[in-house]
From Swiss-Prot:
One of its GO terms (cellular component) is plasma membrane. The lineage of its organism: Bacteria, Pseudomonadati, Pseudomonadota, Betaproteobacteria, Burkholderiales. Its EC number is 7.1.1.-. Keywords: Cell inner membrane, Cell membrane, Membrane, NAD, Quinone, Translocase, Transport, Ubiquinone. It catalyses: a quinone + NADH + 5 H(+)(in) = a quinol + NAD(+) + 4 H(+)(out). The keyword Plastid does not apply. It comes from Bordetella parapertussis (strain 12822 / ATCC BAA-587 / NCTC 13253). This is NADH-quinone oxidoreductase subunit D. InterPro entries: NADH_Q_OxRdtase_suD (IPR001135), NADH_UbQ_OxRdtase_49kDa_CS (IPR014029), NDH1_su_D/H (IPR022885), NiFe-Hase_large (IPR029014). Its main location: membrane.
Length: 418
């Protein structure tokens, strides 16, 4: 009698629904997944090792390139770890700016997650709407750092510069954009960055309503997500879940509330929590988080308008002196030269700093030996713990559901492979 064998299928590494270079070896019985084996490492760039050969400041841009959808949140954990070792604290205005940009980054990430997840499942319109809003938030990145993605804006002791009074303007009309459209876009960018962000926060809840109209009660969307990839609260904790993956299973754990950092303890916001622990609940948690992030951004804008002040500490052994001081004072020039050639030395010790990243708990464990470079840098990526559970979440589901589960895990391989 012929022996019945399971069928092995390679999913990726170039599959459009794989969110990067994921290779999945699926063992199938017909169309039902019996085992899912993720093969990682295809985007490994030795970030942790590279950081050991750069000064503390030079290693900062590597952080942007880990989870390349949530750039400033990665930087935040890194600079917080350095600040712990140095025993310094950023000025209050810098802390508010950091929190505001952390939440802008959270919205950026969730828009990408929501849009790509819907696209994977077969709903294309949401992806296009989400990128319409992402464009505005990318302009905020560009206004403060000059870069739309890899900002390198945070610094140990504060941020690179204060918020600008003007926004980048669009150029002349082209075959893609008429003169009227360009003028309308520039009108929204006529004030300061805070004006632009405030205008965005007024519009954004209506945009989220649009996404929910398209998806939340859509019967096809619900059929594809409800009851798929269920993880109960105890199992979620055992697997090391954090962020929306953990909260979707009904565990109200959010570092912004449980271990507040910067000025999160002064912010008024709620932590959305799921009930069933399936893909649909995780989707609802992310949508609700975008609304809460919008609330936090509004509070930051209001405070920043009324409280001018320094955005960097005054210690010129860590923070660069101003350009005018550098050109008129020899001592400041020496500080500047030493800072950008040799960098600053960090006293021996070790520190762990974690932030509530859009994907979960993103942590940096930093060991210093008194030199101007990290002795050891360990990155705790939330997606790594989530991907290991893919086998458990996908087992017994159809092959099409694997795409839904990968989408709900919100995987980005920059942080997983490092």
């Amino acid at each position: 009698m012929a022996e019945i064998k399971n069928y092995t299928l390679n999913f990726g590494p170039q599959h459009p629904a794989a969110h990067g270079v994921l290779r999945l070896v699926l063992e199938l019985d017909g169309e039902v997944i019996q085992r899912a084996d993720p093969h990682i490492g295809l985007l490994h760039r030795a970030t942790e090792k590279l950081a050991e050969h750069k000064t503390f400041i030079q290693a900062l841009p590597y952080m942007d390139r880990l989870d390349y959808v949530s750039m400033m949140c990665n930087e935040h954990a890194y600079v917080m770890a350095i600040e712990k070792l140095l025993g310094i604290e950023a000025p209050l205005r810098a802390q508010y700016i950091r929190v505001m940009f952390d939440e802008i980054t959270r919205v950026l990430n969730h828009l990408m997650s929501l849009g790509s997840h819907a696209l994977d499942v077969g709903a294309m319109a949401v992806f296009l709407y989400a990128f319409r809003e992402r464009e505005d938030l990318m302009d905020c990145y560009e206004a403060v750092s000059g870069a739309r993605m890899h900002a390198a804006y945070y610094r140990p002791g504060g941020v690179y510069r204060d918020l600008p009074d003007t926004m980048p303007q669009y150029g002349d009309s082209s075959k893609y954009r008429g003169e009227k459209e360009v003028r309308a876009m520039n009108d929204a960018r006529s004030g300061s960055l805070l004006d632009f962000i405030e205008d965005f926060t007024n519009r954004f809840p209506g945009c989220v309503d649009e996404y929910e109209t398209l998806l939340t009660d859509n019967r096809i969307w619900k059929q594809r997500l409800v009851g798929i990839g269920v993880v109960d609260p105890d199992r979620a904790k055992a697997l090391g879940f954090t962020g929306p993956m953990l909260r979707g299973s009904g565990v109200a754990w959010d570092l912004r509330k449980t271990q507040p950092y910067e000025v999160y303890d002064l912010m008024d916001f709620d932590v959305p929590v799921g009930v069933n622990g399936d893909c649909y609940d995780r989707y609802l948690v992310r949508v609700a988080e975008m609304r809460e992030s919008n609330r936090i951004i509004r509070q930051c804008v209001e405070w920043l308008r009324n409280n001018p002040g320094p955005v960097m500490i005054e210690n010129h052994k860590i923070a660069p002196p101003s350009r005018t001081a550098m050109k008129s004072n020899m001592e400041e020039l020496i500080h500047h030269f030493k800072l950008f050639s040799e960098g600053f030395h960090v006293p021996p010790g070790e520190a762990y700093a974690a932030v509530e990243h859009p994907k979960g708990e993103f942590g940096i464990y930093l060991v210093a030996d008194g030199a101007n470079k990290p002795y050891r840098l360990k990155i705790r990526a939330p997606g790594f713990a989530h991907l290991q559970s893919l086998d458990e979440m996908a087992r017994g589901h159809m092959i099409a559901d694997a795409v839904t589960i990968i989408g709900t895990q919100d995987i980005v391989f920059g942080e997983i492979d490092r």
